[in-house]
Amino acid sequence: MPASIPRRNIVGKEKKSRILTKPCVIEYEGQIVGYGSKELRVETISCWLARTIIQTKHYSRRFVNNSYLHLGVFSGRDLVGVLQWGYALNPNSGRRVVLETDNRGYMELNRMWLHDDMPRNSESRAISYALKTIRLLYPSVEWVQSFADERCGRAGVVYQASNFDFIGSHESTFYELDGEWYHEITMNAIKRGGQRGMYLRANKERAVVHKFNQYRYIRFLNKRARKRLNTKLFRIQPYPKSSSD
């Protein structure tokens, strides 16, 4: 990382639709911190900064506590996005998707936000650079997964553009209450729901119930993991189409 970039601004004004500089590994003080080029790159950032941006910019307004790799997306000097990677909501559920997977053998893309001014292909490039960074920093990770939320009116076009495999969908219940959205887990998980769960349960009769599909995407980082996909529960399928198509 160039020493001439001491500060990072959380705005995105530069538009780069083409790769002008060959991407490469980014190091800082001898440590690998990311991958990319001057036009677009990902670098590790602090947890608090990633959470602050997600809380203010992401449509959910909520970060995931299970995230442990926080990547900023930079264009020139500007911080234009954040990707948070970590465990699934149930960390042990990875072995249900790909057999013989331990907690450090996979990652989930818990949250992703990119500035609206960035070109359309920036998301897939950021994911590509993030995967290269994961390979460098976490060589034990064999596959990654993420979910596309039907609430956004999309069926995962970003993951399709990033060459993820679609392995199925499931319907989830969401509650809308006083301008806030709650996943059904918040309602049912007494211990993990916290104050939000208590408030939702106390006001359940006022909440509006919504049901949306959640589309599961997976990207294998090696052939061995692909062969271990739990085909009793999941199978690679044609990409779904979004409601706007």
Curated annotation (Swiss-Prot):
Disulfide bonds: none annotated. GO terms for cellular component: host cell cytoplasm. Induction: Expressed in the late phase of the viral replicative cycle. Mom gene must be expressed very efficiently only at a very late stage in the lytic cycle because its expression is lethal to the host cell. Expression of Mom requires the viral late transcription activator C and the host deoxyadenosine methylase Dam. Dam methylates three viral sites upstream of the mom promoter to prevent binding of the host translational repressor OxyR. If the viral sites are not fully methylated, the host translational repressor OxyR prevents RNAP recruitment by the transactivator C. One of its GO terms (molecular function) is transferase activity. The keyword GTP-binding does not apply. This is Methylcarbamoylase mom. Mn(2+), Zn(2+), Mg(2+), Ca(2+), Co(2+) and Cu(2+) showed undetectable interaction. Fe cation binds at Y59, D149, Y159. Keywords: Host cytoplasm, Host-virus interaction, Inhibition of host innate immune response by virus, Iron, Late protein, Metal-binding, Restriction-modification system evasion by virus, Transferase, Viral immunoevasion. The keyword Metal-binding applies. Its cofactor is Fe(2+); Fe(3+). GO terms for biological process: symbiont-mediated evasion of host restriction-modification system; symbiont-mediated suppression of host innate immune response. It comes from the Viruses. It catalyses: a 2'-deoxyadenosine in DNA + acetyl-CoA + AH2 + NH4(+) + O2 = a N(6)-methylcarbamoyl-2'-deoxyadenosine in DNA + A + CoA + 2 H2O + H(+). It is found in: Host cytoplasm. It comes from Escherichia phage D108. Iron-binding protein that performs methylcarbamoylation of adenine using acetyl CoA. This chemical modificaltion makes the viral DNA resistant to a variety of host type I and type II restriction enzymes by modifying approximately 15% of DNA adenine residues. The modification called momylation changes adenine for N6-methylcarbamoyl adenine and occurs just before packaging. Target sequences are 5'-(C or G)-A-(Cor G)-N-(C or T)-3'. Also usually modifies adenine residues in the host cellular DNA. Belongs to the mulikevirus mom protein family.
